[in-house]
Amino acid sequence: MPLPDFHVSEPFTLGIELEMQVVNPPGYDLSQDSSMLIDAVKNKITAGEVKHDITESMLELATDVCRDINQAAGQFSAMQKVVLQAAADHHLEICGGGTHPFQKWQRQEVCDNERYQRTLENFGYLIQQATVFGQHVHVGCASGDDAIYLLHGLSRFVPHFIALSAASPYMQGTDTRFASSRPNIFSAFPDNGPMPWVSNWQQFEALFRCLSYTTMIDSIKDLHWDIRPSPHFGTVEVRVMDTPLTLSHAVNMAGLIQATAHWLLTERPFKHQEKDYLLYKFNRFQACRYGLEGVITDPHTGDRRSLTEDTLRLLEKIAPSAHKIGASSAIEALHRQVVSGLNEAQLMRDFVADGGSLIGLVKKHCEIWTGE
């Protein structure tokens, strides 16, 4: 399939996707019933969309194009009520978190969808292992060249986005010692990590043509980069966050990305170059492993900074942009989170350290999602 032309969209508009866990009480393992839930809610959703993701234990909630985080929050809140009622009717529950702490990937059923079945054929068991749960945020751009500039700018802050959203310390019944273990699942994919370097949209079109020569890339959706342009939407899509445990944190993360995008495209503070990516995977690893306690290194100067320090610096820089787009509440909430030193991964570990089981942890996550 050829790459579509870049669809011009209103700059800084927003779209958010949340991959949710469908679980089966009282054991709280992953269920294989997302298709049943989708059928139950599809005629009751008035804004946004509820749809499949890779496996039958995953349920994706997606907003429409939104002006700001308040509109997105309203759509998510309405979807949440409908989905929770349908889940209760079918004796199921819903929760966030980047991984299910004890599910077995061998049990996961890939959705009966042409694209996912083709992906299963290409990637084999890796697709079942990819039963992990992330938040994706789209930001509108006026042109393909703007999208490439924005992608490179946002890539500088991938460690910050990972650290702030880290919510996947447990996997396959084990404490991974990572704050965010979810991104590791994709390390075997040939397109894992950052997009190959291009400096403008014309070069990106040439890159995509080259990738399409393989038998594995049929559309932009087949690429698993941390951040990718989405020409059919006219957006840049950030894909590195764990799904948070609460809607409010998901909305705050979206506000952070929207405000950062506004700052990047209005101020143009960086002259991007390929060397920017020299330590990308090392800095990304620090965020996954240690969260905000990680240390990132500047590839140009060798300077090392804690993610806590650098995240506070980012929040300060983008505060004026956040005010202009109505995202100040998100930046203020994230500032409080960083100063407090709390994150969802540590809260999960604290629950287990206090004597809680992994089954009890999932139950707790379901209660958090419903607001109990």
From Swiss-Prot:
The enzyme's E.C. designation: 6.3.2.2
List the Gene Ontology MF annotations in alphabetical order. ATP binding; glutamate-cysteine ligase activity
The catalytic activity, as recorded, is: L-cysteine + L-glutamate + ATP = gamma-L-glutamyl-L-cysteine + ADP + phosphate + H(+)
Query: Its GO biological process terms?
Result: modified amino acid biosynthetic process
Q: How does it assemble?
A: Homodimer.
HAMAP family from the UniProt entry: Glu_cys_ligase_2 (MF_01609)
- Know the name of this protein? Putative glutamate--cysteine ligase 2
User: Could you tell me which species this protein originates from?
Assistant: Escherichia coli O17:K52:H18 (strain UMN026 / ExPEC)
